[in-house]
Amino acid sequence: MIVYKGSIQPSMVCETPAVYKGNLWKRLSQSKFRSSFSLKANDRSYVSEKGMEKVREHACDFIRKRLAPAEIPNDGKQTPMRGHPVFVAQHATATCCRGCLEKWHHIPKGRELTEAEQEYIVNVIMEWIGREIH
């Protein structure tokens, strides 16, 4: 399994430069729904106990299995609202389903995600989690 590291940077975005031109964090903060998410005490404890690298591994696995395939039968419903810090982060960052990825990150539906896109998504999720715990 590939474990992606580092903070998101424009050079890592590859096919999705509009995210940075549109200022992702500002746009997410202006969404009532997206900005309503935060890590609860149990999520923070989980991150503290497992560590960011283990949480990153989980994020890579979730993205590879739940978002990367070209066709997802339950798209829009595949990411629980709670139960893991990565799930919460996915909703907060609009990386929860292919529809949200298309709308917010300009990553088209109907095709398999590239490794660069998966890395970008994991980096967005991990940056949000990092911002939440610090």
Predicted regions and their residues:
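Immediate flanking context of iron-sulfur cluster ligation sites
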Residues: 73-93
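Sequence termini and other peripheral, non-core segments
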Residues: 1-29, 119
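Iron-sulfur (Fe-S) cluster-binding segments and ferredoxin-like electron-carrier domains
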Residues: 99-119
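Short Fe-S-cluster ligation motifs
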Residues: 120-134
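Core of compact, soluble alpha-helical bundle domains
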Residues: 16-63
